């Protein structure tokens, strides 16, 4: 995909399906010729909305459209761009696609954003931020995506790379012009700056993966013995019948998950098989998967029936003392009791799904337990494993620098670190990286 940048492309930039308005974007050197193909013969002023009739090759009317023209380089892609705002009818879209495909080609996923990157309109972190913005489902995800798509990460990473390149410039002056430079003084400053940068990068990487967790959601697993009410709670949180509920123990065999929004933050809630001793092979596999889900979860909700009076002789399922574990007694129906109950020195939260009691408090507890799992608003955090990998490599090579190294070797370490930081923003890149990033975009972006 990276190599084909001289032709003209088009795609639907709005969602598929019926809608009041649909936008078709055209980008490339033949954008205006494509518009002429649709019967628009008069001049179109840049950045001015024009109402025009679009026709097929036989002169038959397709639709009345609002036409916008953005000449290069002042467009999103940096190329000549035409946007057609038409009625969101499947028939209209199909006819326009049929006409345009005779002259230009359909864009590949993410190709508009790729061209924007290749033409210097955005860096890779901004491009990834655009993808996150499109996929954002909660307020917090939206805020993080907006910060990234408007250049906060780019500014941070470029600043660190600039520091490295400045250090490298001073170091190369010592190498190339030793007679003109007070090497001992300059090298002292260089090593001091390297040490400071290592500390900053190390602190930045030691972030608890908050940025990535905000993208993917905090994982909350519901655990407990069979018939503890796990699936009933799961359905209540999901606000739909996502899991089968039955009086027969062992109904849930596989791990089910649903994405929810709690207070503007993303969570993935998982329902699991009841954990008990079983000779049934399928149930054993479900129990195995439940335990694996527990190991990977950020928060565990451990449920027991309300009738439970002691934990003695009961398989604890997981570490009940873990600060990320919430203990719950379910089926507390028709009982006039406080919100919690103490059993063997452990506090259990009481819920009744059927009477809608305690669910709101449980969601509040989940929020409190996950408060430090998300970045604070305004913070600039690592948002993907790709970023983290390059930053870790940069820190690794810079941290390996020592004063006993020949300065030529130190310079090479700094070059590698600058290269790794450049890979994050795309200041240096390879086709494999670009294809991997932009292929995850939707067609019209």
Curated annotation (Swiss-Prot):
One example of the protein's molecular function in GO is:
GTPase activity
Q: List residues of the TrmE-type G domain.
A: 217-371
The principal location of this protein is cytoplasm
The cofactors required by this protein are: K(+)
| The protein's enzyme class | hydrolase
- For the ligand (Mg(2+)), the binding residues are 231, 252
How is the cofactor bound, in the record's words? Binds 1 potassium ion per subunit.
**Compartments reported by the entry:** Cytoplasm
Where is (6S)-5-formyl-5,6,7,8-tetrahydrofolate annotated to bind? 25, 83, 121, 445
Q: Give the matching PROSITE patterns.
A: G_TRME (PS51709)
One Pfam family per UniProt: MnmE_helical
The EC designation for this entry is: 3.6.-.-
Supply the InterPro entries for this chain: G_TrmE, GTP-bd, GTP-bd_TrmE_N, GTPase_MnmE, MnmE_dom2, MnmE_helical, P-loop_NTPase, Small_GTP-bd
Record GO cellular component, one term: cytoplasm
Q: Which UniProt keywords apply?
A: Cytoplasm, GTP-binding, Hydrolase, Magnesium, Metal-binding, Nucleotide-binding, Potassium, tRNA processing
Can you tell me which residues bind GTP? 227-232, 246-252, 271-274
Listed under GO biological process in this entry are: tRNA methylation; tRNA wobble uridine modification
HAMAP family from the UniProt entry: GTPase_MnmE
To which protein family does this belong? Belongs to the TRAFAC class TrmE-Era-EngA-EngB-Septin-like GTPase superfamily. TrmE GTPase family.
Its subunit composition reads: Homodimer. Heterotetramer of two MnmE and two MnmG subunits.
Q: What does this protein do?
A: Exhibits a very high intrinsic GTPase hydrolysis rate. Involved in the addition of a carboxymethylaminomethyl (cmnm) group at the wobble position (U34) of certain tRNAs, forming tRNA-cmnm(5)s(2)U34.
The protein in question is named tRNA modification GTPase MnmE
UniProt source species: Anaplasma phagocytophilum (strain HZ)
Q: Which gene encodes it?
A: mnmE
């Amino acid at each position: 995909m990276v190599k084909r940048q001289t032709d003209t492309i088009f795609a639907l930039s709005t969602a598929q399906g019926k809608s009041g308005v649909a936008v078709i974007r055209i980008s490339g050197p033949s954008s205006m010729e494509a518009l002429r193909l649709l019967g628009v013969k008069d001049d179109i002023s840049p950045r001015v909305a024009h109402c025009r009739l679009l026709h097929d090759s036989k002169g038959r009317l397709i639709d009345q459209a609002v036409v916008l023209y953005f000449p290069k380089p002042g467009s999103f892609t940096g190329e000549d761009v035409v946007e057609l705002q038409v009625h969101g009818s499947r028939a209209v879209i199909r006819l326009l696609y049929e006409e345009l495909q005779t002259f230009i080609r359909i864009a590949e996923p993410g190709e508009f954003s790729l061209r924007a990157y290749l033409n210097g309109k955005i860096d890779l972190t901004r491009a990834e931020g655009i993808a996150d913005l499109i996929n954002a489902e909660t307020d917090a995800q939206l805020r993080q995506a907006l910060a990234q798509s408007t250049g906060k990460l780019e500014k941070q990473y470029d600043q660190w790379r600039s520091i490295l390149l400045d250090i490298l410039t001073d170091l190369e002056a010592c190498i190339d012009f030793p007679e003109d430079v007070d090497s001992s003084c300059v090298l002292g400053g260089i090593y001091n700056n390297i040490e400071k940068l290592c500390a900053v990068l190390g602190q930045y990487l030691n972030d608890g993966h908050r940025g990535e967790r905000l993208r993917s959601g905090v994982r909350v697993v519901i655990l407990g013995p069979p018939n503890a009410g796990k699936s009933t709670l799961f359905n209540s949180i999901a606000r739909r019948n996502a899991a089968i509920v039955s009086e027969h123990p062992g109904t849930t065999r596989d791990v089910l998950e649903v994405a929810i929004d709690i207070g503007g933050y993303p969570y993935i809630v998982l329902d699991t098989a009841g954990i008990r001793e079983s000779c049934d092979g399928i149930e054993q596999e479900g129990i195995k998967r439940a335990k694996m889900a527990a190991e990977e979860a950020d928060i565990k909700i451990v449920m027991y029936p309300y009738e439970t009076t002691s934990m003695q002789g009961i398989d604890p399922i997981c570490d009940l003392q873990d600060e990320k574990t919430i203990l719950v007694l379910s089926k507390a129906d028709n009982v006039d009791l406080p919100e919690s109950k103490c059993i063997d020195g452990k506090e259990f939260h009481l819920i009744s799904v059927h009477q809608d009691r305690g669910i709101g408090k449980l969601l509040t507890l989940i929020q409190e337990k996950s408060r430090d799992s998300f970045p604070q608003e305004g913070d600039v955090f690592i948002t993907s494993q790709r970023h983290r990998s390059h930053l870790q490599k940069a820190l690794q090579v810079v941290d390996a620098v020592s004063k006993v190294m020949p300065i030529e070797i130190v310079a090479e370490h700094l070059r590698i670190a600058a290269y790794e930081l450049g890979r994050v923003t795309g200041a240096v890149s390879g086709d494999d990286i670009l294809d991997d990033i932009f292929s995850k975009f939707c067609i019209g972006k």
